[in-house]
Amino acid sequence: MHPKTGRAFRSPVEPGSGWPGDPATPQTPVAADAAQVSALAGGAGSICELNALISVCRACPRLVSWREEVAVVKRRAFADQPYWGRPVPGWGSKRPRLLILGLAPAAHGANRTGRMFTGDRSGDQLYAALHRAGLVNSPVSVDAADGLRANRIRITAPVRCAPPGNSPTPAERLTCSPWLNAEWRLVSDHIRAIVALGGFAWQVALRLAGASGTPKPRFGHGVVTELGAGVRLLGCYHPSQQNMFTGRLTPTMLDDIFREAKKLAGIE
């Protein structure tokens, strides 16, 4: 049973079956390979359409197998809950001034809840910091029906499926990249700041914004660089359990990043 709605769902969740916030229907086209990802992403005319297409993608066999196996086997703590078990679209404003880039959904976090950074400890830290900065309406993000709202921010990732060992292959990253390219195309006119959670997200942000020059700006926590067109990129260590437990990243450090990002993005 879904922990908020009390409805029963199969794991993985079938498109159009009533899951909170499910953007897809049984008729949503399904990308089965890299070429179809590129074609469908390139033709998406709105964030709503793009989210639906992303959420049913089956282009990477290893990722499809893993995300669905996790959804069926489950973690003991969530054995009584349905798992989303599908690709996770971006979440937040359709006209964001601040874009937050991660890496990929967590197996028992977003792969379970269907919303970016929701249902795991990394997300707990992230959303608490976003709330302290006035960028979301609640410090808690537990499921897709909890009423969380974004204040001119969007959270997304370059890989949409939970990968084994939290490590997508280079080929999987490449296959998935048209989804993020399309998302950037649809929101970039509004973006004034990007927060990259980790070095890979930093490199992706530089590519998205078409950063030129040699050498490229290097990732570091608190590093800020100008991407052109009035967009600033901020580096932030990923709020992983390891980084938080070891003190490499602290709540105060997160607060500093998001206060600065909010200021640079011009969010009230």
Swiss-Prot record:
Enzyme class comes to hydrolase
Highest taxon of the lineage: Bacteria
**Which source organism?**
Mycobacterium tuberculosis (strain ATCC 25618 / H37Rv)
One Pfam family here: UDG
Please state the gene responsible for encoding this protein.
udgB
Temperature-activity profile: Thermo-tolerant.
Activity regulation as described: Product inhibited by AP-site containing dsDNA but not by uracil.
Task: Report residue spans for region: Disordered.
Answer: 1-29
Which Gene3D superfamilies does this UniProt record tie to the protein?
A: Uracil-DNA glycosylase-like domain (3.40.470.10)
Under the heading PANTHER family, the entry gives: TYPE-5 URACIL-DNA GLYCOSYLASE (PTHR33693:SF3)
CDD domains reported for this sequence: UDG-F5_TTUDGB_like
Q: This chain belongs to which protein, by name?
A: Type-5 uracil-DNA glycosylase
Q: Which family does it belong to?
A: Belongs to the uracil-DNA glycosylase (UDG) superfamily. Type 5 (UDGb) family.
Q: Which UniProt keywords apply?
A: 4Fe-4S, DNA damage, DNA repair, Hydrolase, Iron, Iron-sulfur, Metal-binding
